[in-house]
Every structure is written in C-alpha cells, then in structure tokens.
Swiss-Prot record:
This is Cytochrome c oxidase subunit 2. InterPro entries: CcO_II (IPR045187), CcO_II-like_C (IPR002429), CcO_II_C (IPR034210), Copper_CuA (IPR001505), Cupredoxin (IPR008972), Cyt_c_oxidase_su2 (IPR014222), Cyt_c_oxidase_su2_TM_dom (IPR011759), Cyt_c_oxidase_su2_TM_sf (IPR036257). One of its GO terms (biological process) is ATP synthesis coupled electron transport. Cu cation A1 binds at residues 161, 196, 200, 207. It is found in: Mitochondrion inner membrane. It comes from Gadus morhua. Keywords: Copper, Electron transport, Magnesium, Membrane, Metal-binding, Mitochondrion, Mitochondrion inner membrane, Respiratory chain, Translocase, Transmembrane, Transmembrane helix, Transport.
Amino acid sequence: MAHPSQLGFQDAASPVMEELLHFHDHALMIVFLISTLVLYIIVAMVSTKLTNKYILDSQEIEIIWTVLPAVILILIALPSLRILYLMDEINDPHLTIKAMGHQWYWSYEYTDYEDLGFDSYMIPTQDLAPGQFRLLEADHRMVVPVESPIRILISAEDVLHSWAVPALGIKMDAVPGRLNQTAFITSRPGVFYGQCSEICGANHSFMPIVVEAVPLEHFESWSSLMLEDA
C-alpha cells in the first residue's frame, strides 16, 4: 500500500515485482555512477588551469567513450529483456479471470466457473467504513488464491482503459475489441490496490482495482458463497 511522501515503490507482492525492484536498483546504481563520473570530470575541467594537448584529438578517448556506453547499455538491456520475457510467460494457470473495463467501473468473470462474475464499483467517500481508503475501495474485490498462477484476460466495453496493480507489477491496456492477457502469482496474502491508468473520461479517477489474495481454502469458501448468491 502506498503512503504519503513515499519515494520508492510499494512492497512487492509477486515474483515479477520483486524482479522489477531488483532491476530498478541495478539501473539506479549505474545512473549514479555515471552521474558521479560526469560531475567529477566537469568539476575537474572547470577548476584546473592546465590544458591537455591531446583533448581535441585522442584515439584512446574516442575508443573509451564508444565502447564504455555500449557496455553500459548491454548491462541495462540484458536484465530488462529477461524481465520482459518473464512477464510474458503464462504456464498452466490454476485460474483464469476476465476483467472488462467500463465507464467507469470494472467487471470480473471467473471463466473456470459456470456463473461467477460481478461488477466492481468504487465505494463513495460517505459510505466508507473506518480504516478504508478514499477512492481506492471497491464494493466487490477480485479474490484470488495466494501462491497460485493466475491468468487474467483484459478488455474493455467502451473506451480505452488500463488495468494496473503496482504491488503485483501489472499494467495492461484494456482495449475495446481486443483481448490482452497477462499472468501473476501473489507471493503473500493481502489486499492490493490499483486504479485505471489510462484517461477514460470524466470519472477516470473513480475506477479502483482491489485484489485480495487469500489461502486456497478461503478462496473455495468465497467462491461457493458467490455461486450460491448468483
């Protein structure tokens, strides 16, 4: 869960998000070293009265500032490509959920069940219970079993939306007429919040996403109750 004045990412709740955090730290270290080196060179050039007679024509310097940036880009690109392939992998999902974006709410359908689906609307501020979060709570949460591979199919009924949950490392466009898919595994129980991340009209800010990860036996009890109420 994000908090005021937060400078970093939310705590990772999926293996993909953990990889993204590691990659962020890796890239940030490289950027810090480059910035330090450039700042040192600028200060050294400005503060000295000496002049290097080879500064305008030096094959060694030409080779260094050609090869070194290429090596740095490779060190950034290889981990990035690994994570991209990891995010695209969908292996034997235990559960498939279809999320549809509407103006301005989400609807969910558990396709492995015959009649398990619901609409998810934001809870108005005046109806919030103590301890609930303004603009982030939904009347129906998307409940998933913890530590289980989940495939989610994402589309939209009207305009372009985007289904995003930062703690899970997920952001996928919901495009009318097109079915996108991604997968995730929740690494711990909890409630994870997200929002529509594509401007989609007047009430774009009022499309929260709430994913609740629970133990498998709790999920089975929840799904049974939902099917009875259907």
